[in-house]
């Protein structure tokens, strides 16, 4: 099939590679414009653009600032005569004019079990809220935000010690697998009026119950409050990886890996943390050091059970763990 691919971050790259590997013709790639990144503030292409240029040769790569406001770009897309659009973390809402172009529709790979966590940050919110499961849905796109009916969906369990980067890696490959499975079904259903196409595909409308929105994160969301409970703090550290931070003796401290020392969660913790979770700990000022565990990290007080800080990055220094972390922060 002739596929127009929309995507921007590294999360979308496995799907681009999988569709190309499955023999589909990628007739164009749409991604966010180059951005200034790094210490030198050099203009850098998105991961999808970089991979597309390497993988697909002279296939056109379009980088609209605002696809809704660019009729010329929309005309360029129509001229590619794609059979369908595949969208994975593109980063902009597609206007109706674009959604109506491909005869087999526009399909989005969304990283949650819809209708939970519609929006741009489903992975972060899933982890911050402690969801036991998440997954991927292949959804027929419509003008609403992640409201379309679902063709395929697959769930996976979320691990307590899994951070956003690790979960995103798993979900990105699951998205690729599901699109490779979905496209032959979409092709077999054929073109036609949207309602008839979707009926032939037996898509599942989203429920009106259980809807939640993965709102955009603010700077305040990334600040850790030690007066919260250990599990809530841990979930923020995992969900906001690598951005959760606090102030430590006047410097910013990024929190990269923690374990909540909650006895009932011992079977999900590392052996060292599981043993620590069984101890009786004294009450102390939230955020203060209760114990430095040699070769492991620092046990810090919270409003309830303590939390084990295993890896962090102090402002102006490299990330550290174990004894190096203890030396820096003690």
Swiss-Prot record:
Q: Which residues bind (6S)-5,6,7,8-tetrahydrofolate?
A: 112-115
Give the E.C. number(s).
2.1.2.9
- Enzyme class of the recorded protein, top EC level: transferase
This protein's GO CC annotations? cytosol
Gene3D superfamilies according to UniProt: 3.40.50.12230
In terms of domain of life, where is this protein from? Bacteria
The protein's UniProt keywords, in alphabetical order, are:
Protein biosynthesis, Transferase
**One Pfam family hit:** Formyl_trans_N
Its UniProt entry gives the catalysed reaction(s) as:
L-methionyl-tRNA(fMet) + (6R)-10-formyltetrahydrofolate = N-formyl-L-methionyl-tRNA(fMet) + (6S)-5,6,7,8-tetrahydrofolate + H(+)
The GO terms this record gives for MF are:
methionyl-tRNA formyltransferase activity
Family that this chain belongs to: Belongs to the Fmt family.
Per the entry, what this protein does is: Attaches a formyl group to the free amino group of methionyl-tRNA(fMet). The formyl group appears to play a dual role in the initiator identity of N-formylmethionyl-tRNA by promoting its recognition by IF2 and preventing the misappropriation of this tRNA by the elongation apparatus.
Q: What is this protein called?
A: Methionyl-tRNA formyltransferase
Name the species this protein comes from.
Synechococcus sp. (strain RCC307)
Which gene holds the coding sequence for this protein? fmt
């Amino acid at each position: 099939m002739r596929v127009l691919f929309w995507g921007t971050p590294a999360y979308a790259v496995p799907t681009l590679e999988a569709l190309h590997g499955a023999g589909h013709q990628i007739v164009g790639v749409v991604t966010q414009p180059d951005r200034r990144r790094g210490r030198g503030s050099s203009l850098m292409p998105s991961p999808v653009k970089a991979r597309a240029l390497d993988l697909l040769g002279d296939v056109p790569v379009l980088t609209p600032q605002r696809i809704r406001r660019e009729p010329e770009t929309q005309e360029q897309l129509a001229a590619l005569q794609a059979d369908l659009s595949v969208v994975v973390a593109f980063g902009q809402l597609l206007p109706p004019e674009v959604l109506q172009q491909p005869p087999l529709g526009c399909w989005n790979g969304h990283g949650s079990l819809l209708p939970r966590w519609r929006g741009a940050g489903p992975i972060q919110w899933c982890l911050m809220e402690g969801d036991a499961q998440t997954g991927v849905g292949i959804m027929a796109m419509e003008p609403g935000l992640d409201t379309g009916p679902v063709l395929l969906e697959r769930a996976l369990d979320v691990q307590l010690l899994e951070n956003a980067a690790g979960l995103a890696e798993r979900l990105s490959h699951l998205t690729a697998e599901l699109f490779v499975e979905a496209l032959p079904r979409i092709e077999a259903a054929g073109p036609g009026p949207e309602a008839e196409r979707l009926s032939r595909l037996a898509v599942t409308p989203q429920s009106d119950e259980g809807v939640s929105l993965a709102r955009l994160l603010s700077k305040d969301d990334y600040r850790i409050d030690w007066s919260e409970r250990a599990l809530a703090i841990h979930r923020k550290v995992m969900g906001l990886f690598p951005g959760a931070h606090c102030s430590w003796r006047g410097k910013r401290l990024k929190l990269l890996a923690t374990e909540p020392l909650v006895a009932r969660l011992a079977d999900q913790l590392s052996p060292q943390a599981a043993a620590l979770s069984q101890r009786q700990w004294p009450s102390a000022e939230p955020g203060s050091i209760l114990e430095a565990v040699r070769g492991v990290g620092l046990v810090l007080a919270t409003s309830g059970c303590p939390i084990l800080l295993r890896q962090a990055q102090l402002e102006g220094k490299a990330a550290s763990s174990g004894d190096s972390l203890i030396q820096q922060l003690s």
